[in-house]
Amino acid sequence: MLPTMTYFKEALSAPKFYFRRLGEAKPLCRGDEVVVSCTYSAFEAEIEWKGRYYMLYLPSKPNVIERIEQVECEAKERSRGPLLENIVLYEELMLVNSAGHKEYFDVILQEKPKGMMLKDAVTHYKIADLRQAIYKMKARLDAIGFRHNNLRPANIIVCDSGVVRPLRYWYAK
């Protein structure tokens, strides 16, 4: 049984009961509601944990963890460039199935620098500056041989420093 988006949201509402290491995580909320979204490959939420900010992903596709492990190995072998750090936490999220048995699921933490998504940044930065920052990011990705394969505004963060970095590496090559 795979966790649902509703279950993921419930787990984030009371992390100390559902997560092995992320029990002290604080999810992003709107009012009293935990903000969780769904992409093609994962459920995701923004969290604060140990004084740092992360995207927390619960993969909904079997190859996502394997792909992230591969990206991390390659990033360590070469210069990380604009890539953000990913940490796979194995058997992190606990689910109690209908038979009363515990099941554990892997999650991914991806470093999230302070900033805003590209789609929001267009109202705060000059378009020419954003365009140049995107070209620089693409050049840095090319220099380390990294192909994101789904680089669009929802997968790009503009850091407070103006540096542009990619998020969500499921489709990377």
Q: What residue ranges belong to the model's regions?
A:
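Activation of the activation-loop gatekeeper triad in protein kinase-fold domains
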Residues: R168-A172
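Conserved alphaE helix
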Residues: K126-R140
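Conserved structural core of kinase catalytic domains
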Residues: L83-L130
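Conserved hydrophobic "DFG−1" position in protein kinase catalytic cores
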Residues: E46, K112, I157-V158
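ATP-binding glycine-rich loop module of kinase domains
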Residues: D32, Y40-E85
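Catalytic-loop of the protein kinase fold
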Residues: D142-C159
